[in-house]
UniProtKB/Swiss-Prot annotation:
Protein name: G protein-coupled receptor kinase 4
UniProt-listed GO biological process terms: desensitization of G protein-coupled receptor signaling pathway; G protein-coupled receptor internalization; receptor internalization; regulation of signal transduction; signal transduction
Post-translational modification: Palmitoylated.
Organism annotation: Rattus norvegicus
Domain Protein kinase: 186-448
Quaternary data: Interacts with DRD3.
Tree of life domain: Eukaryota
Family as reported in the entry's similarity comment: Belongs to the protein kinase superfamily. AGC Ser/Thr protein kinase family. GPRK subfamily.
Amino acid sequence: MELENFMANTLLLKARQGFTKKTGRSKKWRELLKLPPVSMCSDLRHSIEKDFSSLCDQQPIGRLLFRQFCNTKPDLKRCIEFLDAAAEYEVTIEEEQREFGLSIYSRFFKENSEVSLPQIPPDLVKECKCNLKQSSPSQNVFQDCAGVIYKYLSEKPFEEYQESTYYNRFLQWKWLERRPVTKNTFRQYRVLGKGGFGEVCACQVRATGKMYACKKLEKKRIKKRKGEAMALNEKRILEKLHSRFVVSLAYTYETKDALCLVLTIMNGGDLKYHIYNLGNPGFEEQRAVFYAAELCCGLEDLQRERIVYRDLKPENILLDDHGHIRISDLGLALEIPEGEMVRGRVGTVGYMAPEIISHEKYTFSPDWWGLGCLIYEMIAGHSPFRKYKEKVNREEMERRVKTETEEYSERFSENAKSICSMLLTKDPSKRLGCQSDGASAVKQHPIFKDINFSRLEANMLDPPFCPDPEAIYCKDILDIGQFSVVKGVNLDTNDEIFYTQFATGCVTIPWQNEMIESGCFKDLNEYEDKGLSPLEKHKICSCILRPKRNFFHRLFRRAACLNIAHSEEREPTEH
C-alpha cells in the first residue's frame, strides 16, 4: 500500500517538473495544436464580436498580437510604451513614484521629446505636470492620459489591426481554442482529495504539459442529490471570474460517468494543513496578515462581480507553488442582482455569520465575518468559538456565534485584535467591510500598513512562506477514501440538456494564458512563420473574404475604451 502511494507521488512530481522544462509536452504536441489554414477562419472572422477591450486587452493572445501589430508602426508603438509606463508608475513604490513620474513626463510630454503623444490634449499634459510637482503625487496621475490613448487605439488602429496578418493569426488561435475537449486532452494522475460529488485528481494537458486539478462530479450522484443547479452555478461563476486570488476554470468536459471542471492546481496544500500540521498550531502575525491581504483582494474581486462566497474556512484556501493563496470551491457562491439581498442558511458550522444562522437577509456581510474567523484562526491556532480539538455540537456552536465574544491571547497584537473584533461584529450593519466603502475600508486598517495593495494585486510581493517543490501537501491515497456506488439512479436523455450546458470546452483567458506560459504560442508562431517573407504573409492575409461594411457600420462603429494593464509575459527558453 505504501508502495502504491510512493509511485503515485513520484509520477505526480515528475509531471509537475515537466511543465517548466517542456518535457511534459506530448511528442505529438505540434500535431495536437496544429493551426488551421487561414481560409478555414472566414466564418469566425464574420461572427466574432469586434469588441476592442475583449479582443485586444482581456484575451492574452489577442493582447500580445495587437501589441506586435502596434510595434510595426512608430506612432502606435509610442502609445503602447506610454501605457506600459503609466501602468508601471501605478505599482512603483511610493518613495520612487515622483521621480519615475517625472521621467515619464520628460519622455512623452516635453515639446522636444522624440516619442511625444499628439493625441493627448495640452490641458491634460499641464494637469500631469502640476500633479508631479507635489511631494507625493497621486497614484492616478496618468490615468486620464491613458484613457485618451485607449480610446485612440480602439478606433482607426483597431480597424487596421483587423486587416493585418496579426489578426489572422489571432483567428487561427481562436479556432484552435474552440475545438472540443475530451478526457483524451489530459493525462490523469493521483487523487488529491474529495469534493461533494466526486474526487479531485491531478491532471496534465498532453499538448502543453500544464498541470491542473480535475474536479469530477459524478453524474448519478448529482442527479440523486438534485445538484444540477449547484454544479452549473459553480461552473458559470468560475467561467466569468478572472482573479489571481480565486482558482481559475480552464476547461469543462464530460465523460460517460462524470462532469469535469479543470481548475488551477494548487500544489502548496490548504491553510488548514499549514495551520495545524507544521509545527505548533497557528502562524506568526506577519504571515497571517499577508494571507489576509490576499483574501481581502479575492473577496473584493468576487464582490465586484456581485458574488457572495459564503464558505470561507481554512480548507478552502489553497497555496500555489510560490506561496500565494487562492479561494477555492465556489459551490455555495451566489451572484446577487444589483439592489437585492438574499437569504440562505448555508456554510460550515463555526464559520457561518450570525445573520446566516438567524435566517436574515444579507449581501456580502457573511464573507467579511468569514475573513475575521480566518485571521483569528491563523493567529490563535484555533477558530474563534471553539478551542483546538474541542468537540462542540451544532446547536452549541451556533449559540456561541450569536451570543459570545471571542477571547484574545497574547499572540494577538493590538492591530490584530482590532481587525478581528471589527470583522467579528455581530451586527452586520456595523461590521468592517459592510458599509459603502466595502473592501477599501478593510484594506485601510492599520494591520495592513506594510502591504502595498497595488503591488500585491500585480503579483509583485513575495509571500512569507514558499512550499517545498518536492513535497506532496495532501493525504495519502488510501487515507482519502472512496465514494460508494450510487444505486437506483438512471440517466436519460433529459439529463443531456444539462450536460451540454456544463461541458463547453476551453475557457478563453486561462486557455490562452496556458498557451503563452507553456511556450507553445511562441514556438508554434515561429514554426508557422518559418521561411515566409513579409510579402507572402501579406498574401495570406489578403486571401480572406471580408464582409462589406455598410454606412451604419461606419457611422456607429464601436469605440470601446480599453483597460490595458501592463503585464510582462515571460516565456520558457528553448532547449
